[in-house]
């Protein structure tokens, strides 16, 4: 998995943007980053323009590609040959150059102009992640991938991945009744669940044996993947722009079951 992305100006080694996907304790420290930049300065002279190559420096596994004097670096914690990682880094490179080629040519030195690109990085990486690790052979890999992922990465990314998966799995439904039936069927692929409602504007989903937070003790609501999955599934099924969904009970917090409440207004 990608841990961090660095976008660096070649020659000056100026860091234009650093984007981390992990919780703070897993981020690369200053000394390691300095060593990484030094290694890159020697490596890029041998790098074919547009190609993606990898190397290891100390404990870091690094993917690197360069184009138009901009270096794109991905730090990974597993197989650097992963197709998902290479495609993500390539897409980040292409989108960055597409959006900022004019600004770079006429750059005033203001790094803050690149800050808004973080949202595109998230969209690129986690859309690909969902395709490769969750949507493929669904639901075979859901539980293992999510439980491994949630220990190291920020919860907002789990919700994003869940939503992308829900959107990919859903099909348009003609009625609220058919939605209830389909979402119950979909969730039953990896969890016992109960779907109920008092009217067509609200939906309650109870999961008494939640596989996402099983064995976890936390003061926080821990099922962000399911929260995102349900949100994406409902929005796609009913062609809604957005809905309000919230986990109101969680086994990780000591509740008897996990509960999600969706407001479709």
Language-model segments: residues:
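Short beta-strand
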Residues: 54-56, 65, 195-198, 248-251
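Acidic, low-complexity cytosolic segments
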Residues: 1-4, 10-155, 177, 181, ...
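C-terminal edge-of-domain segments
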Residues: 248-265
